[in-house]
């Protein structure tokens, strides 16, 4: 994991890193990362063969930890998070070997709002599993992608992006269009540069209008038909 960590830094100072992916790193233990990651908000260690969280440094800004598809079970040591990640809000633990007793410590995380425990077979067999989890962790709002009523909840960042895109679309439709701007510009140009047409010019323009009307007449008839 140390080598992957050094590679993922890509020459950056640890103090500047806010997102770190150490996925698919075998070894079974946390290593390499240190307390210099003071601004780290997202840490992903998917499929790393982890059996414990021992060795995790203090990460004061961490709010999302993804530990999917590891080997976490009786020796998970989630109590480490109480000291190392006091601000954590979301933890993904799908695809591990967890039981209800293994995750009881998570109730000590005061800011934990979202938890994914899907694909943990022992938990899935429990009667009233969802009810027990929401009762056990008072701060919990979302479990396995659904709220306390069992309604599916979209990711916050996805909803925000959608709203932003929607606002941009509305501004294009509801704001002054090109035709309005062109008309306004044309009106200003006419006011500034208007010249009284001479008689010859008027006759010529009248002829052009008549010719134009003749050209448009078949289209008008087609529309009427």
Curated annotation (Swiss-Prot):
Domain LRRCT stretches: 121-161
Transmembrane segments: none
Domain of life: Eukaryota
Region (Disordered): 155-225
Coiled-coil region(s): none
Molecular-function GO term, any one: histone binding
Placement of LRR repeats on the sequence: 39-60, 61-82, 87-107
Key words of the record: Leucine-rich repeat, Repeat
Entry's family note: Belongs to the ANP32 family.
Name of the protein described by the UniProt record: Acidic leucine-rich nuclear phosphoprotein 32-related protein 2
Species this protein is from: Caenorhabditis elegans
């Amino acid at each position: 994991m140390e080598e992957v960590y050094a590679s993922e830094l890509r020459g950056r100072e640890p103090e500047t890193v806010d997102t770190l992916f150490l996925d698919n790193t075998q070894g079974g233990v946390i290593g390499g990362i240190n307390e210099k990651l003071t601004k780290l908000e997202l840490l992903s260690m998917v499929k790393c063969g982890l059996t414990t969280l021992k060795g995790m440094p203090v990460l004061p800004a961490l709010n999302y930890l993804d530990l999917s598809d590891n080997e976490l079970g009786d020796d998970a040591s989630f109590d480490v998070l109480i000291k190392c990640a006091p601000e954590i809000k979301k933890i993904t633990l799908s695809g591990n070997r967890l039981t209800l007793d293994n995750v009881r410590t998570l109730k000590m995380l005061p800011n934990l709002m979202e938890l994914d425990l899907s694909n943990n077979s022992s938990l899935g067999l429990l009667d009233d599993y969802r009810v027990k989890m929401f009762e056990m962790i008072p701060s919990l709002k979302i479990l396995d992608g659904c709220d306390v009523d069992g309604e599916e909840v979209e990711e916050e960042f996805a909803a925000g992006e959608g709203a932003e895109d929607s606002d941009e679309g509305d501004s294009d439709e509801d704001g002054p269009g090109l035709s309005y701007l062109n008309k306004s510009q044309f009106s200003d140009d006419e006011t500034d540069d208007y010249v009284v047409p001479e008689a010859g010019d008027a006759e010529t323009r009248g002829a052009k209008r008549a010719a134009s009307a003749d050209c448009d007449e078949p289209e008008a008839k087609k529309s009427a038909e």
